[in-house]
Amino acid sequence: MVTAMNVSHEVNQLFQPYNFELSKDMRPFFEEYWATSFPIALIYLVLIAVGQNYMKERKGFNLQGPLILWSFCLAIFSILGAVRMWGIMGTVLLTGGLKQTVCFINFIDNSTVKFWSWVFLLSKVIELGDTAFIILRKRPLIFIHWYHHSTVLVYTSFGYKNKVPAGGWFVTMNFGVHAIMYTYYTLKAANVKPPKMLPMLITSLQILQMFVGAIVSILTYIWRQDQGCHTTMEHLFWSFILYMTYFILFAHFFCQTYIRPKVKAKTKSQ
């Protein structure tokens, strides 16, 4: 019989942590101060307004070197996180099934999972710096960018506080998408031409991530009715709301960026 303990043991056997993954467990700190994400998000939004006002009458900075380094570091970080977390989530999925990955908390006490969970949360604060490059280089700042950055920080902190197992999928999928996305940003900043389909692929993966996340939320709600799923109705509500808004916004961005221009070009040619 497959149990949460058996699955946890299997994960611990297959995934021995590296030395750096055995660093001090920062979870108690982030769990206690999770609400700090609200003032951080608010300061972020205020700084956006201040920054845009400051740059209004100024010429945009080049920042090519810093942007390459910034994107490269986040790409490497995301690739490492994706490799480790996809390996663990894949093992739990194949060993115990989907319900084990979204309902039972045993596997999240694995040292590797603990490490990549708290550094993932920390990275959501660091990634707010993406917006600084947009503002200082005087590039268009669209709604989906700052909405996504600010709400993901708060949502991740909230889920972290509640130790929600389903959050493992959010972390894992986000690492995977960001591994590709920041690699693309690195190439673009370095004036290396990536494949033309890569931006469309990244947006497609973001849409898929939100769709899968919404499905996971629905399944978590269903399994919770059997009193067999570690979550709260509050977390379920907000996760579903955010996944759906992200899905709609990314789908709209996809249509505006990749579909409408082709339709207009085709119409003009006729």
From Swiss-Prot:
Organism of origin: Homo sapiens
What keywords is this UniProt entry annotated with? Answer: Endoplasmic reticulum, Fatty acid biosynthesis, Fatty acid metabolism, Glycoprotein, Lipid biosynthesis, Lipid metabolism, Membrane, Transferase, Transmembrane, Transmembrane helix
What name has this protein been given in UniProt? Very long chain fatty acid elongase 3
Q: Which InterPro entries match?
A: ELO_CS, ELO_fam, ELOVL3
Post-translational modifications reported in the UniProt record: N-Glycosylated.
**Sugar-modified residues:** N6, N110
What are the EC numbers?
A: 2.3.1.199
The family annotation for this protein states: Belongs to the ELO family. ELOVL3 subfamily.
Tissue localization of expression is:
Testis.
Principal subcellular localization = endoplasmic reticulum
What are the top taxonomic ranks of the organism? Eukaryota, Metazoa, Chordata, Craniata, Vertebrata
**Designated gene of the protein:** ELOVL3
Pfam families listed in its UniProt record: ELO
